[in-house]
């Protein structure tokens, strides 16, 4: 529905609905009904005879991209089924596929990787999968405000994504396995790059957009790292935030809040799900 949002031409919205409707036909992928039936993501399609083919439905990047499109359609139609299906699928991915480094896949496919992460596998944690997983979680975070999605992104950023980057930042690996060595991947389309060379930078560029988000009169601080941000609240009210921290090496985070003029708004600080004790202070005074 992105073209519909830009043009307001109904034919684009109708086409988006048609695509989703075709999912549930006998020959379609049934991405909605399989999610409702709690089919594991690695089992939502039969294993193809040829890996690199249109029949390969386990491809993680492509499957998540379909669910991203469903979220965009939800934003236009408000159909609660669409959001529910995506949240259920993300739950399956977390329980079945995401490893200790915050990403997943082998040969770019879902494969029940969470319980197999201590076993030798090949071409694991494709950077395109890491990027798309972060993007899907970020969209759900923006829509629901559920900080668990930010937790998933943080784990992926500090582990799988950082592991894909060469020490001098000159190259992004296509695969970053939990053992062995990084694999930079093959050249594609007659160019000196591949898909992960393109999507890796998109993942890094997503971090500042994810770190601070504004919704209504609320500023959400989702990611803790030394940074400065200039944000605009509704009514064109600018506010500047400066974050000083050595997190995650240490557990102290200091945030300076500097609105252009006195105004009332909320600051929502992410408390990671793994944190057993969290203390928030304002001007040195602990808050309840």
Regions found by a protein language model. Name each.
Residues 1-288:
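Glycan-recognition and catalytic cores of secretory/periplasmic carbohydrate-active enzymes
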């Amino acid at each position: 529905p992105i073209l519909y949002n830009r043009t307001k031409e109904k034919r684009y919205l109708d086409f988006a609905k048609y695509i989703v409707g075709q999912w549930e036909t006998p020959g379609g992928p049934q991405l909605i009904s399989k999610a409702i039936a709690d089919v594991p993501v690695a089992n939502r399609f039969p294993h193809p005879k040829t890996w690199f083919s249109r029949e390969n439905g386990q491809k993680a990047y492509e499957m998540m991209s379909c669910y991203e499109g469903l979220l965009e359609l939800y934003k236009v139609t408000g159909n609660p089924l669409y959001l529910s299906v995506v949240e259920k699928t993300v739950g399956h991915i977390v329980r079945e596929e995401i490893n200790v480094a915050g990403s997943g896949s082998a040969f770019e496919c879902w494969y029940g990787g969470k319980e197999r992460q201590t076993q030798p596998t090949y071409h694991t944690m494709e950077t395109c999968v890491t990027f798309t997983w972060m993007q899907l979680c970020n969209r759900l975070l923006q829509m629901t405000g559920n900080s668990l999605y930010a937790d998933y992104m943080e784990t992926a950023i500090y582990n799988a994504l950082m592991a894909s980057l060469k020490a001098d930042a000159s190259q992004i690996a296509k695969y970053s396995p939990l053992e062995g060595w990084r694999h930079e991947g093959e050249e594609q389309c007659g160019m000196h790059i591949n898909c992960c060379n393109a999507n890796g930078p998109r993942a890094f560029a997503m971090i500042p957009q994810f770190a601070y988000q504004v919704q209504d009169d609320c500023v959400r601080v989702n990611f803790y790292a030394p940074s400065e941000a200039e944000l605009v609240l509704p009514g064109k009210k600018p506010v500047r935030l400066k974050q000083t921290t050595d997190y995650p090496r240490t557990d102290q985070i200091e945030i300076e809040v500097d609105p252009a003029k006195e105004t009332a708004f909320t600051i929502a600080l992410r408390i990671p799900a793994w944190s057993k004790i969290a203390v928030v202070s304002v001007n040195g005074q602990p808050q309840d």
